[in-house]
Swiss-Prot record:
InterPro entries: Bifunc_HldE, Carboh/pur_kinase_PfkB_CS, Cyt_trans-like, PfkB_dom, RfaE_dom_I, RfaE_dom_II, Ribokinase-like, Rossmann-like_a/b/a_fold. GO terms for biological process: ADP-L-glycero-beta-D-manno-heptose biosynthetic process; lipopolysaccharide core region biosynthetic process. It catalyses: D-glycero-beta-D-manno-heptose 7-phosphate + ATP = D-glycero-beta-D-manno-heptose 1,7-bisphosphate + ADP + H(+); D-glycero-beta-D-manno-heptose 1-phosphate + ATP + H(+) = ADP-D-glycero-beta-D-manno-heptose + diphosphate. One of its GO terms (cellular component) is cytosol. PANTHER family: BIFUNCTIONAL PROTEIN HLDE. It holds the Pfam family PfkB. The active site is at D264. Homodimer. This is Bifunctional protein HldE. GO terms for molecular function: ATP binding; heptose 7-phosphate kinase activity; heptose-1-phosphate adenylyltransferase activity; phosphotransferase activity, alcohol group as acceptor. It comes from Escherichia coli O6:H1 (strain CFT073 / ATCC 700928 / UPEC). Residues 344-477 are annotated as: Cytidylyltransferase. In the N-terminal section; belongs to the carbohydrate kinase PfkB family. The modification N6-acetyllysine is found at K179.
Length: 477
């Protein structure tokens, strides 16, 4: 099985928010100014890129989706440069021009890949009549699959609550990248995407993952949100939804050069994926992968479909990710040539919980590579009953593949993975629970090949069945 990209070409997204122009001056520096203790930069390259809400729209358009952008600008060279840059990448702009204000511009001076200073040219748009923005939203609602409200606290979203209500009445999901600590103004949004510092500024410092979940769920209830996605830098992302287990996704970034605009990339990919008809869990998976790409670039950047595809599929080239059985056999053969010990386990992994994560981490410590074989939906139904699985196969595999402990994820259709194990022949076969080694499917084949079979204990108190029962009781209550 392969993870396929969303059909971005059928996705329509409108972005409304604070648009700005990012200017970059690049050059070498080799001396200190005689006028003051500051470096002298000899500027040899000047770049201009859309920033803020405009960068969100750029990220959406770069995926091949239909992006529309609404915001406030002045009537100046910066507005014209912004419009031209966006038109060049197929973003449809419908700006409201405010003659009394300049277009927000941020100038960054860089040398040797280091940002030395940033200069801001702006006056807030507070007090500007929001009606033209509302009219543009109303005109687009019938032809878009998601509305993004990109808030940089510059005034374009002064009437954000009215915008939310317009979209929700039309059945269009509203995604918001929030600013400040007044989350009351975002009441009723479909999804908020604060980073960890923004989240903690509202709910207080969180020392544990459990505190993030507890306070995040309270925030969802307090402000009538459908979901909350907390982006946590090197710790990845946490998706919280009422009635569902938390989804924690580790970062996929390999190198971090610049986090400028990473939040814009996340919400842009989320919106485009949802507008293409994918689930919120899938949207988070793709957004997490995209964030891992964009922080490896310098300055405000976007992610192309090819880069995103390489991020989610290309892990197979380096020995990671969701694979077909044939791809897995090739990856295992390559691992053996490198002298790596291959560990294999299997299960349904319907609602991933702390017990699963702990078990998989312990299994991974026993070797160099960990394979997780997952029951298909039909296999799960035969094993667990008609009400299972709760999460379909592709979503279960995506979540498992995002775990740091897991190298390869593969599915099987049969009641047991015996045939699959016989074809892979891992060096170590691991199963959780109270099995006897000889009872484990595939054990005979592994032993016959000189391998080992081991039973690991699950963490006490963790059970998918118990989680489902608790959710059902909470709904009744």
């Amino acid at each position: 099985m392969k993870v396929t990209l969303p059909e971005f070409e059928r996705a329509g997204v409108m972005v409304v928010g604070d648009v700005m122009l990012d200017r970059y001056w690049y050059g070498p520096t080799s001396r200190i100014s005689p006028e003051a203790p500051v470096p002298v930069v000899k500027v040899n390259t000047i770049e201009e890129r859309p920033g803020g809400a405009a960068n969100v729209a750029m990220n959406i358009a770069s995926l091949g989706a239909n992006a529309r952008l609404v915001g406030l600008t002045g009537i100046d060279d910066a507005a014209r440069a912004l419009s031209k840059s966006l038109a060049d990448v197929n973003v449809k702009c419908d700006f409201v021009s405010v003659p009394t204000h300049p277009t927000i511009t941020k100038l960054r001076v860089l040398s040797r890949n280091q940002q030395l200073i940033r200069l801001d040219f702006e006056e807030g748009f507070e007090g500007v009549d929001p009606q033209p923005l509302h009219e543009r939203i109303n005109q687009a609602l019938s032809s878009i699959g998601a509305l993004v409200l990109s808030d940089y606290a510059k005034g374009a979203l002064a009437s954000v609550q009215q915008m939310i209500q317009l979209a929700r009445k039309a059945g269009v999901p509203v995604l918001i990248d929030p600013k400040g600590t007044d989350f009351e103004r975002y009441r009723g949004a479909t999804l908020l995407t604060p980073n960890l510092s923004e989240f903690e500024a509202v709910v207080g410092k969180c020392k544990t993952e459990e505190e993030i979940v507890e306070r995040g769920m309270k925030l969802i209830a307090d402000y009538e949100l459908s979901a909350l996605l907390v982006t946590r830098s090197e710790q990845g992302m946490s998706l919280l939804q009422p009635g569902k287990a938390p989804l924690h996704m580790p970062t996929q970034a390999q190198e971090v050069y610049d986090v400028t605009g990473a939040g814009d990339t996340v919400i842009g990919v989320l919106a485009a994926t949802l507008a293409a008809g994918n689930s919120l869990e899938e949207a988070c998976f793709f957004a997490n992968a995209a964030a891992g790409v964009v922080v490896g670039k310098l300055g405000t950047s976007t992610v192309s479909p090819i880069e995103l595809e390489n991020a989610v599929r290309g892990r197979a080239d380096t020995g990671f990710g969701v694979m077909t059985e044939e791809e897995l056999k090739l990856a295992v053969a390559a691992a053996r040539k490198r002298g790596e010990k291959v560990v294999m386990t299997n299960g349904v992994f319907d609602i991933l919980h702390a017990g699963h994560v702990s078990y998989l981490a312990n299994a991974r410590k026993l070797g160099d590579r960990l394979i997780v074989a997952v029951n298909s939906d039909a296999s799960t139904k035969r094993l667990k009953g008609d009400s299972r699985p709760v999460n379909p196969l592709e979503q279960r595999m995506i979540v498992l593949g995002a775990l740091e402990a897991v190298d390869w994820v593969v599915s099987f259709e049969e009641d047991t993975p015996q045939r699959l194990i016989a074809g892979i022949l891992p060096d170590l076969l691991v199963k959780g629970g109270d099995y006897k080694p000889e009872e484990i499917a595939g054990s005979k084949e592994v032993w016959a090949n000189g391998g080992e079979v081991l039973v690991l204990n699950f963490e006490d108190g963790c059970s998918t069945t118990n989680i489902i029962k608790k959710i059902q009781l909470d709904k009744k209550g």
